[in-house]
Amino acid sequence: MEKREKLYEGKAKIIYATDEPDKVIAYYKDSATAFDAIKKATIEGKGVLNNKIASFFFQLLNEKGIPTHFIKQISDREMLIYKVDIIPVEVVVRNIAAGSIVKRLGIPEKKEFDPPLVEFYLKNDELHDPIICEQHIYAMDLAKPEEVQKMKELALKVNDVLREFMREQGIILVDFKLEFGRKDGQIILADEISPDTCRFWDAKTGEKLDKDRFRFDLGDLIEGYTKILEKIQKKEGE
């Protein structure tokens, strides 16, 4: 597999072409951003941790029959993935109230949602990723109704798998953000699953082990992410 030119650079990753047109390489950067990149920093080692954590989660989901863009981890910072046409909609699944929903709706933090909530956000930095409904998605021709239903179905399946897996490691999956893409006419999971995109709380102590550590200066980010990686690697080694 030959790594070729840079195709795209985002806040957390760089995408490179390969000598196979349907495959690309995702390189995980050490950048940390919050609040629409108003707060940003370079944190050495963050990219390595996120690549390893995301690779583990994608492999787990692939094994559970959930289609993802992940092929394999190829280095500490890189994974080989399928090239997809990204749908510009972020799908958020919430098991427990935290973050923006608390501020937006006045819902008490830590309120449990049963069943989990599924929300859609327009993937647009200039507009600050506003929350949207299904009708907005159709009106803007972002996705077809059957695609939106598939995204919801897959998001809830991801929640079932990861919530139970993390519970077994003593970690609460509070909420998470997913992105999806089209490949050969099918909807598959894309982007990443990591402490950048999920909220993880220690079930015993309530300690936050995700990007909220950086957002709100709650503690060392690397320490929190390392705890997540150690938990899942310990399980993998059993």
Curated annotation (Swiss-Prot):
The gene is purC. PROSITE patterns: SAICAR_SYNTHETASE_1, SAICAR_SYNTHETASE_2. Pathway: Purine metabolism; IMP biosynthesis via de novo pathway; 5-amino-1-(5-phospho-D-ribosyl)imidazole-4-carboxamide from 5-amino-1-(5-phospho-D-ribosyl)imidazole-4-carboxylate: step 1/2. Its EC number is 6.3.2.6. HAMAP family: SAICAR_synth (MF_00137). Belongs to the SAICAR synthetase family. SUPFAM superfamilies: SAICAR synthase-like (SSF56104). GO terms for molecular function: ATP binding; phosphoribosylaminoimidazolesuccinocarboxamide synthase activity. PANTHER family: MULTIFUNCTIONAL PROTEIN ADE2, SI:DKEY-6E2.2. It comes from Persephonella marina (strain DSM 14350 / EX-H1). It catalyses: 5-amino-1-(5-phospho-D-ribosyl)imidazole-4-carboxylate + L-aspartate + ATP = (2S)-2-[5-amino-1-(5-phospho-beta-D-ribosyl)imidazole-4-carboxamido]succinate + ADP + phosphate + 2 H(+). InterPro entries: SAICAR_synt/ADE2_N, SAICAR_synt_PurC, SAICAR_synth, SAICAR_synthetase, SAICAR_synthetase_CS. Pfam families: SAICAR_synt. NCBIfam families: purC. The keyword ATP-binding applies. One of its GO terms (biological process) is cobalamin biosynthetic process. Keywords: ATP-binding, Ligase, Nucleotide-binding, Purine biosynthesis. Transmembrane segments: none annotated. This is Phosphoribosylaminoimidazole-succinocarboxamide synthase.
